[in-house]
């Protein structure tokens, strides 16, 4: 019996309060809101390169990591630390971003009109 990849095991759980799937990172401000929400609650994981239905699409380039880094450094106050791991799953790259619950909360991030708001992650 083939052992399940750790990322496939996470995907099998489906999205919930501590797990979010992102097809791609195209908006650093939007990702900053997700980083802040995880940091302000119980922490969590972002799986970049995974569609909402759980299908693995893979990340397209190194730029995805740099957009997450920019989101944290430029658009979260105080900055939300994160750890990122690249995984190869069935020939596709998935970027796992772990955000711990923060001792420095509340963290804020800009809304769609650039007002910095305190956000939380709910189920």
Regions found by a protein language model. Give the residues of each.
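Conserved N-terminal catalytic/coupling substructures associated with nucleotide/phosphate chemistry
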Residues: 1-123
């Amino acid at each position: 019996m083939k052992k399940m990849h750790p990322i496939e095991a996470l995907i099998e759980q489906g999205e919930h309060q501590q797990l979010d799937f992102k097809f791609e990172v195209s908006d650093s401000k939007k990702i900053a809101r997700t980083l802040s929400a995880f940091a302000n609650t119980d922490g969590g994981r972002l799986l970049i390169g995974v569609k909402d239905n759980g299908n693995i699409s893979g990340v397209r380039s190194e730029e995805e990591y740099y957009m997450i880094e920019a989101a944290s450094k430029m658009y979260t106050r105080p900055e939300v630390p994160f750890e990122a791991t690249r995984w190869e799953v069935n020939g596709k790259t998935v970027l796992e971003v772990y955000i711990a619950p923060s001792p420095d909360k509340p963290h804020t991030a800009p809304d769609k009109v650039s007002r910095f708001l305190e956000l939380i992650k709910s189920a």
